[in-house]
């Protein structure tokens, strides 16, 4: 049976792990969200999130955005290649509804997978 958990091993945890993604990444972006990715040596993808206070002022809004992105990653982790991904949230994402944000991030997962595999 396929597991859809978001365990600790599926997260980027240390500053060094985040920093490595910023060096020569594969990119997929929209006006509101940018995904940066590099291949990893693990047998699964890993996710790191950054939601700047500059773009999303309220903590509950930042948490909502991170929750939707984590949930989408959790559900699509088996379709994503073995890469480390950092999600950068920019201005405009705060006005998006959860369903709209979910749809956008799904589109970006597919775009990133195509760029990595193609």
UniProtKB/Swiss-Prot annotation:
**Recorded E.C. number(s)?**
3.1.26.5
A single GO CC term, please? ribonuclease P complex
Please name the top-level EC class of this enzyme: hydrolase
Q: Which GO terms describe its molecular function?
A: 3'-tRNA processing endoribonuclease activity; ribonuclease P activity; tRNA binding
A Gene Ontology biological process in which this protein takes part is: tRNA 5'-leader removal
Catalytic reactions of this protein: Endonucleolytic cleavage of RNA, removing 5'-extranucleotides from tRNA precursor
Where are the bilayer-spanning segments? Answer: none
Report the sequence similarity comment from the record: Belongs to the RnpA family.
Task: Describe its function.
Answer: RNaseP catalyzes the removal of the 5'-leader sequence from pre-tRNA to produce the mature 5'-terminus. It can also cleave other RNA substrates such as 4.5S RNA. The protein component plays an auxiliary but essential role in vivo by binding to the 5'-leader sequence and broadening the substrate specificity of the ribozyme.
| Protein name as it appears in the record | Ribonuclease P protein component
Origin organism of this chain?
A: Shewanella frigidimarina (strain NCIMB 400)
**Lineage of the native species?**
Bacteria, Pseudomonadati, Pseudomonadota, Gammaproteobacteria, Alteromonadales
**Gene expressing this chain:** rnpA
């Amino acid at each position: 049976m396929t597991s859809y958990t978001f365990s600790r091993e599926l997260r980027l945890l240390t500053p060094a792990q985040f920093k490595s993604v910023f060096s020569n990444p594969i990119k997929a972006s929209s006006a509101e969200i940018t995904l940066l990715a590099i291949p990893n040596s693990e047998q699964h993808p890993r996710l790191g999130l950054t939601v700047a206070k500059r773009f999303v002022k309220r903590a509950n809004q930042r948490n909502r955005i991170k929750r939707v992105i984590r949930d989408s990653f959790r559900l699509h982790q088996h379709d994503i290649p073995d890469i480390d991904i950092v999600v950068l949230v920019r201005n405009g994402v705060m006005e998006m509804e959860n369903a709209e944000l979910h749809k956008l991030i799904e589109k970006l997962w597919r775009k990133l997978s195509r760029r990595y595999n193609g």
